[in-house]
Amino acid sequence: MGDKRATLAEAMATVPDGARIALGGNTLHRGPGAAVHEIVRQAKRGLEIVKTAGAYDVDLLCATGCVAVVSAGFVGYETPFGMAPAYRKAVESGVVEAREHACATVIAGLRAAIQGVPFMPVAGLQGSDLPAARGFRAVADPYSDAQVYVVPALIPDVAILHVQEADSAGNGRILGTRFEDVLMAQAARRVVLTAERITDGAAFAEAPESVAIPGFLVDAVVSAPGGAWPFSCTPHYGYDAPYLASWVAAAAEPATARDFIASHILTSTPVPA
């Protein structure tokens, strides 16, 4: 499969303005933090972000003007940090369009993309306002004539995922919960992996069952020790609570958010403490 290694800047330079990007991880865990920071530094514009449950990644990209649309089931920090202030301001002001989902409808859309079908049935939407809010349609089950809601295929242009280990051919190993990363890799047109370490491919050949993301799906792999930060990355580090608390406080107002971004991201490459 060849050597797919690239620098972080090279890999993110292949992401065009207006792309639909699926970001791996979930809330504050194993998100592609280094890649998100590089997207900010490269001043991408007009992006659509796809994620079941986003937090710092979506919040920061909204604060920096990178995002036009967010398709997600949830955006917020949970834990002690509360809501995502920059995301909320961007949506309330009309700068960002929130395409509301349930986490299950994001997953169903990705599965439709994987299977090459235009839509996927989803149970459990009856009685909610989500179909009306999003225009999800109901169709007749051909076997029972019961009405079932379906969601359209959700095809990311690029999936950006952080893994604990990868080899130069792009095979990626995830330790712990995989979240929706495997679905994103299978559904996307292109895949970029960032990895805590690049290891000898022989280790993957000896235990192929440990490969979560096969190299034939991957277009670029980046050596990025600490590349999930400020998200957690089991078993290497937890999420950076002091940094996240500082960001959430700064993100409450556009001026303080700009100052934070200028001092912590644009003029430096953050690394885990």
Where on the chain are the PLM-derived regions?
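Conserved alpha/beta enzyme-core scaffold
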Residues: 1-273
